Amino acid sequence: MKVYSLKRILAFGLAALMLLAVAGCGKSENSSGPNSGGKDASSSGQQGNADVLAKYIDENGKIDTSKLTPYKAAEVATVNGRNIIKHNGKPYLYNALHFRYRGLESGLAAPIAKKMFEEGMQKIKESGVDTVILYIYWEDMYDGKTYNFDNLKYQYDVAIKNDLKIQINWFGYDNCGYGGFRKWQKLRSKYPALQVDDPDITEEVPDLSQQIFVDEEIEAIQQLCAFINIYDKDRRTVAIQLENEPDMGEGGMGNWLSQFSVMVDLLNKLGEAVHNSSYSMITKINLTMSGWDEVWEGLDYPARVNKVIEQPHLDLVGPDLYDTNTTQDISFYNKGTNIPAHLELGPSVWSAIGQGVYHLINGYGMGWYDLIDIGFSGHHGLYRLNPDKYEERDGTQILGTPYKGEIEGSTKEFIAMSNSVGALKELLASVPTSDMAGFNIKMKNVASDTKKLGDKKITYDYSNPSAKYGASGLVLKGPDGAYYCFSSQAADFTFPSAPSSVTYGSYNDGAWSEAGKAAANGAKITLEPGKAYRVVL
């Protein structure tokens, strides 16, 4: 989606020091609990009725929202002293994989693009990640006169067939600094351009303070939510990202820095439109490090980020830096009711495993970018696309920009960890972060890492001197007093005393479902990758 410069990567570290020095600001929480009556998001099956929208739309394809019963699918809640997402009334672990259908369409013939999209959805299901992030472009559902939801129907049908939860990435006026005027917004007397004196802004920029721009995008967002209300019968849609990297100036639009407060106001109004729509869900914003060393409207980078977090209708604000082999601290975003999330986190690099464990123990979300690299260069994705099949990564090197020879991870190892995470997602989404510990997050190939949970010391041992990188593990204390754990590769956990019971399985609806028993060697337990364990001392 973008290319990061070395300057930007280096800037992240310096900016992080700036960010951590800034005091946190609160955010008002969207009130009221979820409505009842929706099916659980895990129920499967396609909609099976291509004309399900027919009775709701007019001659221009617009949905009559007055005919719909509003539904609140997801919201921020405080549970066990931490901010969490509740989806259909249950804790939801933000563990999602990006997959862009348009990226396939732009690089492949239509039949092959559909084939690869459908196979890709199966790959996501098999990966252990339970949520796909679909990319919805304004112009794919509206041409200035008529709404057409066929593209959305197709993407939803394939996601539903594979029983995946859904998040939406919405592309409107700003997309990595591209976007700007819509194709139908040509008449400048009706759609005025912003008057700006900045040599870095090389394209016409819509003056987003003008009500017509706000009204048109709000209508589009409301229509999208109405479509979801009707078509997503299982209420599996959790969240919507408003715009994409609104602070990125890559495309020469400069919307963010040229009219910062106006852009933030627009984002909040879009969030309000979602919260008051026929399908209310989590709203999120992804930010880059663009302009981290600049002051605009009297605000430096940390102050600008704080202003976004403070907005009452933006539930989740986080960064999307992913082209690095060091664990990134995003605690700066942990303030008010905001739930920090790494909105674009590369699964292709070896460090993704340790970064994932870091996010889990801190209660942060993970938006894995992506299933395959949309540029067909093989850099970002969990899989390589070559050119019409999915190839697993096997730990060789990522040769191109922006990774510059960095060691890639293993697709199999990522899937193993995801299966372990999936087995414990209910606990990972809700237990206090003080009851979780991550081990060997830096992924050394020889490590003995001891952490304390309450009054218990637990040691994680991994040793493979010939490996390019090591493994990482996690332990949490459940509400039943048992310890739940996993490791990304075979490794040992040593507890303070010999356990009375060690089993593997999954935790669902408040109960442990045992799949088998495991042996302990005194106080030591050897974990296999891909499993989740329950240890009773």
Where are these regions (language model features)?
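Aromatic-lined substrate-binding rim segments of carbohydrate-active enzymes
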Residues: 114-189, 260-281
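The substrate-binding groove and active-site-proximal loops of carbohydrate-active enzymes
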Residues: 96-112, 135-150, 197-219, 246, ...
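Catalytic-core region of carbohydrate-active enzymes that cleave or remodel glycosidic bonds
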Residues: 164, 274-276, 303-413
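Aromatic-lined carbohydrate-recognition surfaces of secreted/lumenal glycan-active proteins
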Residues: 169-171, 232-245, 260-303, 318-322, ...
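Active-site-adjacent "subsite" loops/lids of carbohydrate-active enzymes
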Residues: 152, 173-226
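C-terminal motif of bacterial Sec signal peptides marking the signal peptidase cleavage site
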Residues: 20-24
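C-terminal beta-sandwich/jelly-roll accessory domains of carbohydrate-active enzymes
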Residues: 448-537
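N-terminal carbohydrate-binding accessory modules
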Residues: 45-129
